[in-house]
Every structure is written in C-alpha cells, then in structure tokens.
UniProtKB/Swiss-Prot annotation:
Residue stretches of biased makeup (Low complexity): 967-978
GO terms classed as biological process: mRNA 5'-splice site recognition; mRNA splicing, via spliceosome; regulation of alternative mRNA splicing, via spliceosome
Superkingdom of source: Eukaryota
Protein name: Pre-mRNA-processing factor 39
Pfam family, one: HAT_PRP39_N
Organism of origin: Drosophila melanogaster
Biased composition annotated in UniProt, kind: Acidic residues: 48-64, 226-236, 245-256
UniProt record similarity statement: Belongs to the PRP39 family.
Segments passing through the bilayer: none
Functional description taken from the UniProt entry: Involved in pre-mRNA splicing.
Ranges of Basic and acidic residues composition bias in the record: 274-301, 318-358, 575-602, 957-966
Region listing for Disordered, in residue ranges: 1-76, 145-358, 552-643, 951-985
Bias (Polar residues): 171-190, 200-211, 303-317
C-alpha cells in the first residue's frame, strides 16, 4: 500500500485485456469483479454502493490539466504511442485525487494514496512499459470498482470499514498479480501497488493493450441478495410523508438545497430505489422522533432495510412477517387499535391547536394594549398598536385592534383604508366589503375613502356596469355637494368616458356645473371640449337636439320673414324713385321723339324704335321681374323647412345646424356656470380659512373655530337645507371634539321640526355625539333623553340615562331625572327601587337626606302613603340625627294628616331638641316652632307655658354662647381680618342642617355649570343670608327678641316668624 499523505492519480483506460500485449477476452475480467465474493459481502457492498452515489467526483476540473500535459508531451513520443494515446483519452475516466496533505481515509481511490508523478522524457515512457501489466490490472480494477464498489469520499462516516474492505480486495487479487508477472509476455519488473509511488503515471499509455469499445464489454453484474424476492417499483412501499407541526414554515422547492446527482448512466437502478426508501425512512424518523416515537417505530418497521440488523432470519422480509402476524389477530382488536389511534390523533391535534394559539400570541401585544387601556384618549398609543398588528400575521389581533380604535375615532378615514387593505391582503373579500361599508357609514363625506372603495369595486366588479354606476351614484349623493369633491366627480366622468358613453358624461356635467366646487372653471372648460370634439348626436340627448334644431329653424324663419318685410319696404321706396325716373325718361323720350319726327320729316328716315330704346325698356322690365322672383324664392325657402323637414331624423343634420346646436347647448350651461361662479365667490373666503378639514385630536385654533361658526351662519342664512347639512357634517369632522358645534346642529334641526325626516336626523346626531365623541358629557345625554321622551320613547330615554349614570356616577341631577322619567311613564315600583338604591348607595349624608325628603313627598303625594313617607324620613333621621331639614319635613308631613296628632309632632320636636350635640341656635329654632305649634294646635295651656319656658332657657343659653364666641381671641382676630360681619351659626344653619354636609348635597340647574358637575361649594339648597334665614316679624309682639338678643350686631337676632316658613322648600 502507498504511504499516507500522498495523492493518487489513477487512469482507467476503459475495459481491456489484462495482459500486456495480447487482448484477453472480455469474459476474463468478470471473475475479478464480484463473482468471487460471498453473498454476505455482496449485501455489504450493495450498502456501500448506495453511499458511493453521494460522493462528488470532480472529473472535469481534474481532467483538463492532465489533458493539457498529455497534449504538450505528445510530440516527443513515438508515432505508435501517439495513436494509442489519442484512443485511450476517449475512454479514460480520470479519478481526481484530494488536495495535498489529505488523510488516506479521505482519498477518492480505494487503494490508498499514490504520489502524482510527471514524465518529461521518453526514458520515463520506456520505464512505464515494464509496468504496463500491473497498471492495466489496477486501472481495470479501478474502472470495475467504480461501478461495483463504493468510492471513499470526504464525507463518509465509516471510513475504517471501507478501508478494510479495500485492503481485503487487494490481498485477494495478489495471486493473479503474481501469475501475470511470471508470464513471458509480461514485463520483467514486479508491479504492485506499493511500487506505483515511484512510477511515472502522467502518461500511462499501454502500447500492447487492445482497445475495446464499451458496446463489446459485458454489462455490469447486479449484486445479488440471497433469498430476496424481486419486486417491481409499484410493489415497494412509498415513502410516507412526515407529520409536520401546524406551525411549520412552507417553503418552495427553489429554496431547498441543490442535490448532488453525480450518478453515471451505468449505475444500477436497484440501489437507487433502496436509497430513496432509506432516506425517506431516515427523514421520517428524524422529524417524528421527538413527538411521535411510538408511531414512528411502527412506520419504520414496515419499511424494508436490508442493512439494518434484525433478529429475524433472511427467509422472509420483515414486512411480510408483520403482515402474517396482523392477519392472525382478530379483527375486533384491529378496530379497537384504530379507534385508539384516532383518539390519540384527535387529542394531539387539540393539544397542538392550544399550543399554537399560545405560541401565536404576539409577544409585545399586551404591552401596546396596556397603554391604550389605561388611557383610551392616547392617540399615539393607538397608532403604535395598529402599526404593530399591521406588520404581524395575527388576523384576530389586528381586527380587535382596528375595531376598538375605530369605535373611538371613526372619523380617521385613513385607518378605515388600512383596515380594508389588511382584509384584502388576507384574501377575504366579504370582510373587506364589510369594513368599507362600516367606514362609509361612519364618515360618508370622505372623498378619499369613497374613491378607494370605488377602485375596489371596479377591480372586482368591472364587468357589471350597472353595479359600478350605482356605487358612483351613491358616492356623489353622499358627498357630491362637498366643496372639495372634484376628485370624485372627475373619477365618475373618467369611468363613463372610458366606455365612450358621452351622453352620460354630459348628464354628469349638467349636475356638476350647478354645484360650487373648488375646480368649477376646469369643469366648464372640459364640458366645452367634450361638446366641440364629439358629434352632438352622441353627446346630447335626442330630445335636446330636436328642440335645438327646431329653435334654429324657427329663428331662421323669423329672420327670413323680417328680411322679406324689409325688402318690401325697400322695394316700395325704390319703385317710387323708379316712377319719377320713368316719368323723366318719358318726358325725355317725348322730346326725343319730337326731334326724331322732325328729323324724319326733314330727312325722311324709316319708322320704328332705336336699339337703345329697346334695350332700355328691356332692362327696366328685367329689373322688375328679378325683384319679384327674389321675393317669391325667399318666401318659399322660409316656408319650406317648417313644412317638409323631419326634425327627429338626425341623419339629415347639416353643418350649419350642428354649429348652432353646439353653441346653444354651451350657452345654456354657461348661464348655470355664471351662477355657480357667484356662489363660489361668496364662499371662497370661508373655504380659504379652513386649514384642517380632517379629524385630529389636537385642538383647533380660535381663528379656525370662528371661521366655522361664521361659515355655518352664512349657509343657514342662505336657507338651502341640503347645503347646510353638508357643511355641518364637514364641520363636525374637523370639530368633533367640540360639543358646541353638535349643539349648534341640534338647534338648527329643531327649527326644522315641520319637515320630514328631521326626527331621524336629530336622533342620529345625538347618537354620534353621545355614543362616540362625547360619551362623558351629561348635558348632551340629558338633552337626548328629553328628546326621546318627547317622542314617547321612554325605554330609550331610560337606557340613555342609565348609561351616563354608570359612566358618571354620583350626579344628583341624573338620579332625579331617572326617577322622574320612570314616574312619568307610570312605573311607580321602579321609582321606589331607584329611590332606595340611591339613598343606600350614597355616602354623603346631605345627599341621602335630600333624597329621603323627595322620597317621602313621592310616597305621600303620588303613592298616597303618608306613613311610608314618615318611615323613610325616620330612617334618614336615624342615619343623620342632626339633619334639620329631615326633622322639619317630618313635622310638615304630620301636619298634613286630616286630623293633626299633637303628641306625634311634639315628640318629634322634643326628640330633636334632646340631642346632646345640638347647637344653641337650632334649639332656639325648634323651641320657637314648638311654641307656634302649641299656640295653633295645642289642647292645653300648660303645655304652651312649658314650651315658652323652654324657649326662654334656650335663648339665655344662646346669648351666653354668643358672648363667649365674641369674646374669644380667635373670634376677634377672625372678625377683624374680615371686611364684613361674620354670620352666626344659626344663620348659616338655617334650613341647611347646621353644617357643611348639606352644602355638598346640592346640584345646580344654572347654565354656569354646563355639565351639572357636582362641586363641593354648590349647596343643594343655597345657604341663606341672615335676613333670609330670619323669619318675618310676625311674632315680634311675643317679645322673644328682647333681652338684647335681637340687638346683637351681625344680624344674629332671633326674629322668628311663623313656623310654616319652611314651607318655602316646596
């Protein structure tokens, strides 16, 4: 064997005789290939043949330099060698060696590495002759083994096994090599594989070798496998497709790596088939090993693999044995196994779907959603979210994001376009149309969105002319009056013009020229070009052409009649002149005649007229006759068209008529165009002031808001309802976040109550304002509820109030409105439920007391249940014992009984005054009430006297408390720091619960608080001044103010009026 680290360059000069001079028969080479090998060795070698197909033999790259060397050295050889060399090169297959320094295991030749030697002289060639026999033998073996033995490539996995096989082959061939060397015709030198290291093999030409063509050689024998049944390709099991996960990426065949197909035509077909089977089995096992080990083992066992070690004998294939075993099993077990397999597959599919959902969930989606959920008005956060989902492949996440965003900002027409384009990319046309319809309903004045939608319609329904035209008509009806709708009109005209439907184009221009738009001049110029460049019969309607034609002939007839009458007048005047001239001529003629007579008489000339006279008379006659003929011809021509021309026959139009019809058609539109120009001029300044006609969350400038208000006032003053509504819609797109413009539109629509369809318009405006753009404005919701209640839609009104109550809780005005709506519709049980709900849910004692008072009145006056009203007030008083208003309301309800219960009223007063924390002023107040009540309704004088004593004691204590408060340093500092007098506790507490709790309980109906916001300083019942809190001096004669109490400064005197003063609360 050759030493390691050397390269081998072996030449296989075709299949030839093994002797050096005489050609052996082709059959002599057959035993040296495979017939001497055992069946076991054949099986192993067949496996190696399959591996040999994967080796890349770079024949072309190595063949060129050696061919060049042979060609350069050929002139130095003898002629017999030149002829032999050229014949050999046609059959030689060059086996390239690996690069220098490659290990023996990576060599491409099975007999080890041999150094590459070059011969430069003829002596080297002579030395080569002595080694011709051995070279021929080795080259033949190399050529044979190229088809029967695997070549060792750089990527083989079992190099050691292959090396041992190759060494075994060489050792088995040593006897033959010795016999060949001992023969007479062989060379004297021993040629073995080791000696080739010193030999020159660059020009390995063998002189005595007979060249045999490949057709004369026997076919390569196929490796035989003992006890193997021959089967066709159809009988072999097909490679089963691996079960890939659902999220596996689909790639095309172009993206797959190129396969190395270096197999020659002489390679056997059977190893290829087995290799394909083995590769399919290996790929299936590799892909399914992680998730389906059990199923993979079953599938791989069914494939036939001759090289795999099995415990079964070679008498039968494993697949056949398995079939026999399966046939022996009962059919029921087979069915059960199949069912179990199906169930397992279903479970695996379900698990894979769940895993796929979890896996497909976008990683950063929650981060973007968190930003907009925390602040739904964060427009920038919404844009980031939509940009993120638009770039991902999760359709459900994208739909959810777009739907939520557009529910908050439906006037962003650009995102409707993006949403529709996203659905179009997904290939779902139905969803794309739904998105377009939703967008056009939300923002019908978006010209760009309409154009985008119409392009989509034309691309999908281009053949349906009727449908496309209906969509264009729908578009111009929705936003055709918009001042900047020129692009839409131009697109409509262009579409009709492409199909050469010029009469429809003229009809569109008739509508467009009457609308003030930004490109009004261009539209009229285009219309003129259309009329002048095409025949009037295809541009104008037949009725219009016939009418204009009749007008033309009528004008011509009137012109002819006028010209004939003028001609008559001219002819009459000219006839008079002619008569005078004729008279003069006659006189001249008479004179001439006399002279002629005299001459004839004198001369004796002939008788008759001269030629001049005859000519003159003929000229006069001819003049008269021509005048008559012209008059008759003109009158005939004028009467002929009216009598004989068929105006409906447009084929008889002449050039003069066509010119007249065009001029008249254009002039008629020019009048409309002039009116449009004036309308555009009046609106141009307002249109120039609109700097942002689209929607955005950023606030508008004051100049922009003022311009919109002035523009709306201008259109309202003009009185065109359709144009006013279009302008309002344009304004609301740019000013959607300003509720004043919504209110302005509602007030305008309320002025149109007598007109039809106004109710639906008002309801739609309320819906958009309250549900979309201003969902947290109570004022708009209260107005909407009142509108629906006026339309007798109590259910809708209650729903509106319930929604705003949930969004803006703890608003007393909303609570009262909800209760009263239910009361007006007669749902008294619902009223009780709402009263109890609000009383129990409120945390403010003052608000709870106010609600309890109203609830008691409701029970007394509406439900006629006074005892239930007293019970409600009693519960409220127990919750807030210091609430003066609740106690006074209880006294009032007791007084409204048919028979006043003295004991009941006195108990209420005594219980309230018996509190330990009662203020002196409040105690004085209730003592006064008790005295007044007993004076009017008391049954005994003793009770009245006791009440008077209690009042005097209360006044004394109140006076002492007043002096202490006035004499305290803090009191002096506070009084000196303030400009005006400080009201006492009695004044501040008059009918106001004596504290700040009630001050928070109020709500304000005034216009100063447009959203009925509940402020801490807004009192439910505004605190009264001392003059308002004091009673009138009805009982001044009682003298309760004496003793200096009434003389106190600051208006803190107790001038008590009649007890019924708290009736002012009703």
């Amino acid at each position: 064997m050759a030493s390691e680290g050397e390269n081998v360059v072996m030449e296989s000069p075709g299949r030839r005789t093994r002797s050096g001079r005489k050609a052996a028969s082709p059959a002599a080479s057959l035993p040296t290939r495979s017939t001497r090998r055992t069946s076991k060795r054949n099986v192993q070698l067949s496996d190696h043949e399959e591996e040999a197909e994967e080796q890349v033999v770079m024949v072309q790259e190595e063949e060129e330099p050696f061919r060049g060397t042979n060609t350069a050295e050929a002139p130095a050889l003898e002629p017999q060698f030149e002829e032999t060399q050229h014949q050999i090169e046609d059959d030689v297959e060059m086996l390239p060696a690996e690069a220098a320094g490659v290990d023996e295991k990576s060599s491409s030749f099975p007999f080890g590495t041999v150094a590459e030697l070059h011969s430069e002289t003829s002596d080297d060639i002579k030395e080569t002759r002595g080694q011709a026999g051995v070279d021929t033998l080795l080259a033949s073996l190399a050529g044979d083994n190229a088809n029967s033995l695997p070549s060792v490539g750089g990527n083989d996995e079992s190099d050691n096994v292959k090396k041992a096989d190759f060494e075994y082959n060489v050792d088995s061939l040593q006897p033959q090599m010795e016999k060949m060397n001992s023969s007479e015709d062989s060379s004297s030198q021993h040629a073995i594989a080791e000696d080739l290291a010193d030999a020159d093999t660059s020009n390995a030409t063998i002189v005595n070798t007979e060249i045999v063509s490949e057709d004369e050689l026997p076919l390569p024998s196929k490796p035989e496998i003992n006890d193997a049944e021959e089967v066709s390709d159809e009988e072999l099991p097909a490679p089963q497709r691996a079960e890939l996960p659902e999220d596996a990426e689909v790639i095309s065949e172009d993206e797959l790596p190129a396969s190395n197909n270096n197999n020659t035509a002489t390679e056997p077909k059977a190893p290829l088939k087995r290799k394909a089977e083995n590769e399919s089995v290996k790929s299936t096992e590799d892909k399914d090993a992680s998730s389906h080990e059990s199923s993979t083992k079953d599938k791989s066992s069914e494939q036939y693999n001759p090289g795999s070690p099995t415990s079964e004998s070679n008498d039968a294939q494993p697949s056949e044995k398995k079939l026999k075993v399966e046939e022996s099993e009962p059919k029921e077990k087979k069915k059960e196994k199949e069912r179990d397999k199906d169930k397992e597959k279903d479970k695996d599919k379900d698990n894979n779907k769940d895993k796929e959902k979890e896996r497909k969930k976008l990683p950063d989606l929650d981060k973007y959603w968190r930003a907009v959920k925390e602040d739904s008005t964060d427009f920038t956060g919404w844009t980031y979210l939509l940009q993120y989902v638009d770039n991902e492949s999760d359709a459900e996440a994208a739909r959810e994001a777009y739907d939520t965003f557009l529910s908050h900002y439906p006037y962003c027409y650009g995102y409707w376009r993006k949403y529709a384009d996203y659905e179009k990319r997904k290939g779902i046309k139905a969803n794309c149309y739904k998105v377009f319809e939703r967008g056009l309903e939300a923002i019908p004045l978006s010209v760009d969105l309409w154009i985008h939608y119409l392009m989509h319609v034309k691309s999908n329904h281009g053949d349906d002319e009727t449908f496309v035209r209906s969509q264009y008509e729908r578009a111009v009806k929705a936003c055709g009056l918009e001042f900047r709708s020129d692009k839409l009109w131009d697109a409509y005209i262009r579409w009709e013009n492409e199909s050469k439907r010029y009469h429809r184009v003229v009809q569109i221009y008739d509508r467009l020229l009457a609308i003030p738009t930004q490109g009004y001049n261009g539209h009229f110029d285009n219309f003129q070009d259309l009329i002048n460049q095409h025949d009037v019969t295809i541009t104008l309607a037949n009725e219009e052409v016939i009418r204009l034609r009749k007008d033309f002939h009528e004008r011509q007839q009137s012109k002819s009649s006028k010209s004939s009458s003028k001609h008559r007048r001219d002819s009459s005047s000219s006839s008079k002149d002619k008569d005078s001239k004729e008279r003069e001529r006659e006189k001249d003629k008479d004179k001439d005649k006399d002279k002629d007579k005299e001459k004839r008489e004198t001369v004796g000339g002939g008788v008759g007229k001269s030629p001049k006279d005859t000519s003159e008379t003929q000229v006069d006659e001819s003049d008269s006759t021509t005048d008559l003929t012209t008059e008759s011809e003109s009158s005939h021509a004028a009467s002929k068209p009216a009598m004989q021309i068929d105006f409906s026959d447009l084929s008889t139009l002449n050039d003069e008529e066509v010119v007249s019809i065009r001029d008249r058609a254009i002039s008629a539109r020019r009048k409309v165009h002039k009116l449009t120009v004036s309308a555009v001029t009046a609106r141009w300044s307002f249109e120039e002031g609109i700097k942002r006609p689209y929607f955005h969350v950023k606030p508008l400038e004051r100049a922009q808001l003022k311009n919109w208000k002035d523009y709306l006032d201008f259109e309202i003053e003009k009185g065109d309802r359709e144009r006013v509504l279009v302008l309002f819609e344009r304004c609301l797109i740019a000013c959607a976040l300003y509720d004043e413009f919504w209110l302005k539109m509602l007030r305008y629509l309320e002025s149109l109550e007598d007109q039809s369809g106004v109710v639906d318009l008002v309801r739609d405006v309320y819906r958009r304002a309250c549900r979309i753009h201003h969902p947290d404005k109570p004022s708009l919701h209260l107005m909407w509820a009142a509108f629906e209640e006026c339309q007798m839609n109590f259910d809708d009104a209650a729903e509106i109030l319930q929604r705003i109550d949930q969004r803006c809780p703890n608003l007393l005005q909303l609570s009262y409105r909800r209760i009263n709506v239910e009361r007006r519709r007669g749902a008294l049980d619902k009223c009780r439920e709402l009263y109890k709900h609000y009383i129990e849910s409120t945390k403010n004692k003052g608000i709870a007391g106010s609600l309890a008072i109203k609830y008691a009145r409701f029970l007394n006056k509406i439900c006629h249940d006074l005892d239930a009203g007293l019970a409600a007030l009693q519960q409220a008083l127990e919750r807030d014992p210091a609430n003066t208003r609740v106690a006074l309301q209880m006294i009032d309800l007791c007084l409204q009984r048919p028979k006043v219960d003295e004991q009941e009223v006195v108990e209420i007063m005594d219980k309230f005054m018996a509190r330990a924390d009662i203020e002196p002023d409040q105690k004085v107040l209730f003592a006064q009430r008790k005295v007044e009540f007993l004076e009017d309704f008391g049954s005994t004088a003793r009770g009245l006297q006791d009440a008077q004593r209690a009042l005097q004691q209360a006044l004394t204590k109140a006076k002492e408390a007043q002096k202490k408060s006035d004499g305290s340093p803090s009191r002096k500092n506070s009084s000196s720091s303030k400009e005006g007098p400080v009201p006492t506790g009695s004044a501040a507490a008059a009918y106001n619960n004596g504290g700040s709790a009630a001050a928070v309980a109020g709500y304000n109906y005034g216009a100063a608080n447009p959203y009925y916001g509940q402020q801490n300083t807004a009192a439910a019942y505004p605190s009264q001044t001392p003059q308002q809190a004091s009673y009138d001096s009805y009982y001044n004669q009682w003298g309760y103010g004496s003793g200096g109490a009434s003389a106190n400064s600051g208006g803190s005197g107790y001038n008590y009026g009649q007890w019924s003063g708290y009736g002012n609360y009703y």
